């Protein structure tokens, strides 16, 4: 690998910062101390700092020269509601809150790049987006709705995530869909309760909900093109409390994912049609509440071509995978992708334990790798 020497020299200093953030994890939209630390460091490095963008987001801006070129680099800051089970000397000090997805590392790597870039000559505007609430709460959307790109516009936006694939590759990137969309549905099946001995006098929501659960699985198997990808997963089914009472209501919660907008739209249409049909057939009411968690993380071809050249220079072509299969997991960087030319990459974490696990450990070696990637992207574009 051909990492930036000055960044490697700063590795130890920023490991301590990462460990400090790890010890003090904060959930989405509650990243007050993390945001304060980020803002403080950026000010020390000489950046213009803007706080409370999208509630707890932070933006650092550094302009040099007279070019109109603008590049955005993004990192997420939030932790997960999970009890840490590692034996790390810097393990979480908070009960049931843990950096189990490596966002402490993402944030620190961008701070490391920020310090290095402040000492470099470039021509244009460097925008650093420190995003809150990636874990299902729509922090990216909140920043955008708070005027992120009106105030701090970028021609391209780049981001990355650590991934414990267990591969010998170090860097992963592809054109098109990198990660799936994610939509959550909460469905209420409303019938009429009654005595278990007289089902004919009730309108059984459990029976109707059971039909619904089975019918929903036909969307992927019978409606989605087999060459496309979609997932419909029922995560919760609740109804009743007694063995001899037919309840009034049954509830279903599910996650729906797709790798393209056409398939995503198709699944949504089928969900509503199936619910309507089962409601009519069983003389009950079905209410649907949909929440958009994240759009497809759709990488832009131009941005990928540019980022790929940087990755080859840093990691060596043999250590890069440019046709990696997209993941059915989601990432709200997809909201950025809907607005700007973006490229979202994965860096190998070299750890067997997967994300969102109480024993997960972020690999500190990624700090210099990711910071070098961020820095090279900025310097190459703003040359």
Swiss-Prot record:
Its EC number is 3.5.1.32. It is an enzyme of class 3 (hydrolase). It holds the Pfam family Peptidase_M20. GO terms for molecular function: hippurate hydrolase activity. The keyword Hydrolase applies. Cleaves hippuric acid into benzoic acid and glycine. Belongs to the peptidase M20 family. This is Hippurate hydrolase. The gene is hipO.
């Amino acid at each position: 690998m051909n990492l930036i020497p000055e960044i490697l020299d700063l590795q130890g200093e920023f490991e301590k910062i990462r460990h400090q953030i790890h010890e003090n994890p904060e959930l989405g939209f509650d990243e007050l101390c993390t945001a304060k630390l980020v803002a403080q460091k950026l000010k020390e490095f000489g950046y213009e700092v803007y706080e409370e963008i999208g509630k707890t987001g932070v933006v650092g801006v550094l302009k040099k020269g007279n070019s109109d070129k603008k590049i955005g680099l993004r990192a997420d800051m939030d932790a997960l509601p999970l009890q840490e089970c590692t034996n790390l000397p810097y393990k979480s000090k908070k009960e049931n809150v843990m950096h189990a997805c490596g966002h402490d590392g993402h944030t620190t790597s961008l701070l490391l790049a920020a310090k290095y870039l402040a000492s470099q000559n470039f021509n244009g505007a460097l925008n650093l987006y420190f995003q809150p609430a990636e874990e299902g709460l729509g922090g990216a959307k909140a920043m955008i709705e708070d005027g992120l790109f009106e105030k701090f516009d970028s021609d391209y936006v780049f981001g990355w995530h650590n991934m414990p694939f267990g591969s010998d590759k170090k860097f992963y990137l592809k054109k098109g869909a990198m990660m799936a969309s994610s939509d959550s549905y909460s469905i209420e099946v409303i019938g009429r309760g009654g005595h278990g001995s007289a089902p004919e006098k009730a309108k059984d929501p459990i029976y109707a909900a059971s039909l619904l659960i089975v019918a929903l699985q036909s969307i992927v198997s019978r409606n989605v093109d087999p060459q496309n990808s979609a997932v419909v997963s029922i995560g919760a089914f609740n109804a009743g409390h007694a063995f001899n009472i037919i309840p009034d209501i049954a509830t279903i919660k599910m996650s729906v994912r797709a790798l393209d907008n056409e398939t995503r739209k198709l699944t949504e249409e089928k969900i509503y049609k199936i619910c309507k049909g089962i409601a009519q057939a069983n003389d009950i009411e079905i209410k649907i509440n949909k929440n958009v968690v994240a759009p497809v993380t759709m990488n832009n071809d131009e941005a990928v071509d540019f980022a790929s050249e940087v990755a080859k220079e840093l990691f060596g072509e043999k250590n890069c995978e440019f046709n990696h299969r997209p993941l059915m997991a989601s990432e709200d960087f997809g909201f950025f992708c809907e607005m700007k030319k973006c490229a979202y990459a994965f860096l190998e974490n070299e750890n067997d334990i997967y994300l969102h696990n109480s024993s997960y450990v972020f690999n500190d070696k990624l700090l210099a790798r990711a910071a070098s990637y961020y820095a090279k992207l900025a310097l190459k574009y703003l040359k």
